C-alpha cells in the first residue's frame, strides 16, 4: 500500500499508474468560481461536476433573474467546463433561503419545466429547508410535486448547524409522505454524523460536504465511510463564493489512502456512486474522454 506523507495534497500530474484518481464532484457551484479552478480540478482528476441551483448571496428581485440563472447553468457554464475537459451537469430550483417568499417561489417553479428537457439537467435541486419554517416547507413540497409529476431526481439541502437534525427529520417525513418518489431517487446532502444514518435508513443516497470549517472535514467524512460503509454515499466540495475548497474531494481521496483504504473503495465513493445516482436520470450520458469508463 502506497502511503503519502502527512499534510500534503495528492500529486497533481496525471501519470499512468500514478496517484491521480479520476473523480466526480456531485455538488459544486461553479458559477461562483474562477476559471482557474476548472484547470486545478482537471489536473487533480475531476472529470464531471454537478451544479445545483443555489442562493446568489442576495435575494433576486424577481423571477426573470432565475430564468437568466437557469440559462447560465444550462448553457454558459457547460461550455466553460468543457474547455478544461470537465463535463458539467446541473439541477434547477429556487433555493431554500429564498423560499420564504412563496409567491416568487411559485413563479420560479412554474418556469422550471421550460428547462427540464435540456440534456444537461439532472433534476430538481438543491431544494430543502433553511430555518425550518412553514413557508420553506410549502415550497419544498411544491418542488417535490414537480419532481414527482416529471419523474425527476431530487437533490436536497439540509439546514446548517443547530437546525440540521430537526430539519433533516422534517425533510425525510415530507419525502416519505410523497409516495410518488422512490427513496433511491433522492440524495440528502450535507449529512453529518448525527444525520447520515437517518437518511441512509430511509433508503436515500447521501452527500457529505467537505468544508474547511463547517459541515464536514475530509477526516470526519472518512470516519463516516468507515462507520456506515460506502453504499449510497457521495462526497462533494459544495464550493461556492464563500470559504470553500474546490479540491476538497481529492483531499478525501488523500485521507482515505493515508488510512490504508483500497483504491476500489475510494473510487466507489468519489466516482462510481455519483455516476450510479445520476444514471437514474434518463437524460444522463457520460463517457470519459480516455475511453476508460462510461455511463450510458
Predicted feature locations:
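Short helix-capping segments at alpha-helix termini
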Residues: 82-84, 177-182, 228-229, 258-264
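Mid-to-C-terminal alpha-helical segments outside catalytic/metal-binding sites
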Residues: 2-17, 250-296
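Short hydrophobic/aromatic-enriched beta-strand-loop microsegments
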Residues: 48-51, 205-212, 286-287
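Mid-domain alpha/beta scaffold segments of enzyme catalytic cores
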Residues: 2-162, 166-174, 186, 190, ...
Amino acid at each position: 500500500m502506497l502511503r503519502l506523507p502527512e499534510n500534503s495534497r495528492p500529486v497533481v500530474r496525471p501519470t499512468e499508474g500514478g496517484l491521480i484518481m479520476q473523480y466526480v464532484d456531485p455538488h459544486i457551484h461553479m458559477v461562483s468560481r474562477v476559471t482557474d479552478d476548472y484547470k486545478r480540478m482537471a489536473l487533480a482528476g475531476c472529470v464531471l461536476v454537478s451544479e445545483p441551483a443555489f442562493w446568489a448571496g442576495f435575494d433576486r428581485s424577481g423571477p426573470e433573474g432565475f430564468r437568466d440563472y437557469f440559462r447560465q447553468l444550462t448553457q454558459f457554464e457547460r461550455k466553460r467546463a468543457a474547455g478544461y475537459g470537465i463535463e458539467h451537469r446541473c439541477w434547477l430550483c429556487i433555493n431554500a433561503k429564498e423560499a420564504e417568499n412563496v409567491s416568487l417561489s411559485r413563479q420560479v417553479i412554474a418556469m422550471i419545466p421550460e428547462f427540464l428537457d435540456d440534456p444537461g439537467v439532472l433534476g430538481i435541486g438543491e431544494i430543502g429547508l433553511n430555518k425550518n419554517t412553514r413557508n420553506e416547507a410549502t415550497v419544498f413540497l411544491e418542488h417535490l410535486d414537480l419532481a414527482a409529476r416529471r419523474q425527476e431526481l431530487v437533490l436536497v439541502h439540509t439546514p446548517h448547524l443547530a437546525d440540521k437534525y430537526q430539519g433533516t427529520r422534517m425533510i425525510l417525513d415530507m419525502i416519505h409522505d410523497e409516495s410518488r418518489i422512490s427513496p433511491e431517487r433522492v440524495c440528502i446532502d450535507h449529512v453529518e454524523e448525527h444525520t447520515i444514518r437517518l437518511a441512509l435508513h430511509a433508503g436515500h443516497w447521501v452527500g457529505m460536504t467537505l468544508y474547511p470549517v463547517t459541515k464536514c472535514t475530509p477526516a470526519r467524512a472518512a470516519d463516516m465511510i468507515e462507520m456506515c460503509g460506502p453504499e449510497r454515499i457521495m462526497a462533494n466540495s459544495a464550493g461556492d463564493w464563500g470559504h470553500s475548497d474546490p479540491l476538497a474531494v481529492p483531499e478525501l481521496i488523500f485521507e482515505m489512502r493515508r488510512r490504508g483504504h483500497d483504491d476500489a473503495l475510494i473510487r466507489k465513493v468519489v466516482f462510481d456512486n455519483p455516476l450510479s445516482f445520476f444514471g437514474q436520470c434518463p437524460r444522463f450520458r457520460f463517457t470519459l474522454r480516455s475511453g476508460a469508463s462510461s455511463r450510458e
